[in-house]
């Protein structure tokens, strides 16, 4: 479901790991942008009709035979173009300059000396000064195309920043999109808002209006089914669709018995009672827990839950009858990855979602969030008036508590885990830390230890606590709680939850660990 935007930046992706970061920086300025892989760049230009283009970095070498190039048309369209890292090198090569393997490779922190004032540096960096940037290159430009001048140099790159201001072509060897390049975001703002003269008037309010109109146009009088879990994405999808088509929407909450304490009831209260959304609550806990009985392999647990979810959802949809559309909370990173320049990354864990449903059920898709990043989905949720407890909540996996219960899952262990997790999150909120943490949760380990309570000996489970900080979940650091917080939280869990006599804190970063334990 594509939406038209008058001022759009096209980002051509050559496979950089930080291409999405460029897009997020541009979106944060209030300017809409799209990422397209280099193979589809020409089609993207014709479809989007961009007002500016950014060429990303890449793991490729410009020198290698068959390495990707940008369509020559972009340099002939009389629109501003910014090349970053590999993007700088192909701009130079394609316009008549030269690139060679550098004797000194630059990876990580470097320093750029500003040689000339430029519209790209205006109000940010001054001639004669030196600034920290982030480099990641082995090749480097050795000769400039006609019309370009050097505006910045570094120890390993004599042409670290270049410009042809008459044609509004700019290129840098460093990465302005990463936080390690000081004031890099301001350089991008200069390119997008000043050099390209884009207005910065794209907002969640305008996205909401345009998306509602598109939903109505696409769906017409047809009925739509939406799987609702209470997570951020499905909650925003449900409320947005309900605003667009009202009672044509029916939501299904598949309660697999693996949700957090009181979670199912909170979802029912908000969406059925407050929003008056047609919501079917399917209590399938016995089915799921019986199927999981005795299973200790985490991948098999995930696949069992995913398979049963599809079966239950499909059965409920048949009971409703007559629905033509299935709503999904597909986000923009999913879209980018599915058509990425390099291809999808290796699967570390199976992802539990409804990806297999449309084919099985012969339904059309409606994906109102497919142009948004996660932080933008939260902003849209605020625009729609969703409570903070839903839009600000930490990520929760589709398989639920089953993967926070390593080993075999039982009803008893789930109840113990629910209580411990609720106490942990309560203490985090009381300490005012919830919004500082990307994700926090308890894990009930398949290990029992000896303890002493009162005059008696205990032999009960170990509870691990996990909390991480992250920007996008791709990498994460453990949260550095003070010992007083950990001591208080551990004491509450041990005193209030029957079945736990020991609490530990996980101080593993990602990588090498993953955020979830299974």
UniProtKB/Swiss-Prot annotation:
GO molecular function, one term: GMP synthase activity
CDD domains given in the database record: GATase1_GMP_Synthase, GMP_synthase_C
Classification via InterPro entries: Class_I_gatase-like, GATASE, GMP_synth_C, GMP_synth_GATase, GMP_synthase, GMPS_ATP_PPase_dom, NAD/GMP_synthase, Rossmann-like_a/b/a_fold
Keyword list, A-Z: ATP-binding, Glutamine amidotransferase, GMP biosynthesis, Ligase, Nucleotide-binding, Purine biosynthesis
Associated pathway: Purine metabolism; GMP biosynthesis; GMP from XMP (L-Gln route): step 1/1
This enzyme's EC code(s): 6.3.5.2
Domain of life: Bacteria
Positions that bind ATP: 229-235
Keyword RNA-binding carried by entry: no
The keyword rRNA-binding belongs to this UniProt entry's keyword annotation: no
Residue ranges constituting the Glutamine amidotransferase type-1 domain according to the UniProt record: 8-201
Catalyzed reactions: XMP + L-glutamine + ATP + H2O = GMP + L-glutamate + AMP + diphosphate + 2 H(+)
Pfam families: GATase, GMP_synt_C, NAD_synthase
GMPS ATP-PPase domain ranges (all copies): 202-393
GO annotations of cellular component type: cytosol
Record text on subunit structure and interactions: Homodimer.
Role of this protein: Catalyzes the synthesis of GMP from XMP.
Protein name from the UniProt record: GMP synthase [glutamine-hydrolyzing]
Native species: Bartonella henselae (strain ATCC 49882 / DSM 28221 / CCUG 30454 / Houston 1) (Rochalimaea henselae)
Organism phylogeny: Bacteria, Pseudomonadati, Pseudomonadota, Alphaproteobacteria, Hyphomicrobiales
Gene that specifies this protein: guaA
């Amino acid at each position: 479901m594509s939406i038209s935007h008058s001022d759009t930046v096209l980002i051509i992706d050559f496979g950089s790991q930080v291409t999405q970061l460029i897009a997020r920086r541009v979106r944060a300025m209030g300017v809409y942008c799209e990422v397209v892989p280099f193979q589809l760049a020409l089609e993207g230009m014709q479809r989007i009709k961009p007002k500016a283009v950014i060429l990303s970095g890449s793991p490729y070498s410009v020198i290698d035979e068959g390495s990707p190039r940008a369509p020559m048309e972009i340099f002939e369209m009389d629109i501003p173009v910014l090349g970053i890292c590999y993007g700088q090198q192909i701009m130079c090569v394609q316009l008549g300059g030269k690139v060679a393997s550098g004797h000194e490779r630059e990876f990580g922190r470097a320093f750029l000396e500003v040689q000339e004032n430029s519209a790209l540096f205006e109000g940010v960096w001054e001639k004669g000064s030196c600034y920290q940037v982030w480099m990641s290159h082995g090749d480097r430009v050795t000769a400039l195309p006609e019309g370009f001048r050097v505006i910045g140099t570094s120890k390993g790159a004599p042409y670290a920043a270049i410009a042809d201001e008459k044609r509004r072509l700019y290129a840098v060897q460093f990465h302005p999109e990463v936080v390690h390049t000081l004031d890099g975001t301001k350089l991008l703002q200069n390119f997008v808002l000043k050099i390209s003269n884009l207005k910065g008037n794209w907002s969640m309010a305008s996205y909401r209006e345009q998306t509602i109109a598109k939903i109505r146009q696409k769906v017409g009088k047809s009925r739509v089914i939406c799987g609702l879990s209470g997570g951020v994405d499905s909650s925003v999808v449900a409320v947005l669709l309900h605003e667009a088509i009202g009672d044509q929407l029916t939501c299904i909450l598949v309660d697999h018995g693996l949700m957090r304490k009181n979670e199912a009831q909170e979802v029912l209260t908000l969406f059925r009672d407050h929003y008056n959304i047609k919501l079917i609550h399917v209590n399938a806990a016995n089915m799921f827990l019986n199927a999981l009985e005795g299973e200790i392999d985490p991948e098999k647990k995930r696949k069992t839950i995913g398979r049963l979810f599809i079966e239950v959802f499909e059965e409920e949809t048949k009971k409703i009858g007559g629905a033509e559309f299935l709503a999904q909370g597909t986000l923009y990173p999913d879209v980018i990855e599915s058509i990425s320049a390099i291809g999808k990354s290796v699967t570390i864990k199976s992802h539990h979602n409804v990806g297999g449903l449309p084919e099985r059920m012969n339904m059309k898709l409606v994906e109102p969030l497919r142009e948004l990043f996660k932080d933008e989905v939260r902003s849209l949720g605020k625009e729609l008036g969703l409570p903070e407890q839903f839009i600000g909540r930490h990520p929760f996996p589709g398989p639920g508590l089953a993967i926070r219960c390593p080993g075999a899952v039982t009803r008893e262990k789930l109840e113990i885990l629910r209580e411990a997790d609720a106490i942990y999150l309560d203490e985090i909120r009381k300490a005012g830390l919830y919004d500082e943490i990307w994700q926090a949760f308890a894990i009930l380990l398949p290990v029992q230890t000896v303890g002493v309570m009162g005059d008696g000996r205990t032999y009960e489970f170990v509870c691990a606590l996990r909390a991480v900080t992250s920007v996008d979940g791709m990498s994460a650091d453990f949260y550095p709680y003070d010992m007083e917080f950990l001591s208080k939280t551990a004491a509450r869990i041990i005193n209030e939850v029957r079945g736990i006599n020991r609490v530990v804190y996980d101080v593993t970063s990602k990588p090498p660990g993953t955020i979830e334990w299974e």
